[in-house]
Amino acid sequence: GQRFMRIDHIVDERMDPYTSTSAAMSLLEYNYSVLGTWPLALTAYNHGAGGIARAVRETETTDIEKIVANYKGRAFGFASRNFYAQFLAVNEVEKNALEYFGDVRFNPAPNFREVQTDAFIDAEVFASSIGVSLEQLRDDNRGLRPVVWEGNKRIPAGFRVKVREELVPSGDILPMVLADFKFAMQTPDIAYVVERGDSLSVIAGRFNT
């Protein structure tokens, strides 16, 4: 995941459906550039490009059916062995959704603007400054971890915040956040050195948690 996404204790872009989908596409393109066929690239999404390259070497074929039937790699288990077939099944169901599920009505996709922050900004301050609720901002930016929404960390500088077009005015909205609420540094982590006699409940009590 870290090849194409930011994953740390403040941001986890795997939780953002838009960013993670884009990253998945980038990974598939990378797998294809390494392995040369889409069946292998898709299987590598589960098993890794290196693992599939090893399977190709050991079976001396790029035919996914022959690899599935003959490759005996210890890590090549049920999920990897059936990943491509499952993809084909999902694709078939999606193409014939009406037959399988009836008349499904999808909600229209939201229209977002992405605003790249120019400083570290508290999430609640950012939301109130641009006129949206904190809950709405959180729902639209799931890549930010709970520490941001709980106020323990700020939205990082350079983070691309999604805001719904219909909820904010046109034009640059960053100036709506006053300079006094923009910081050059992230909120520092709290460190504590365990002392003799400490227990988890004692430490938690000292930090009111």
Segments predicted by a language model, with ranges:
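Extracytoplasmic and endomembrane cell-envelope/extracellular-matrix remodeling and assembly machinery
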Residues: Q2-R3, I7-V34, P39-T209
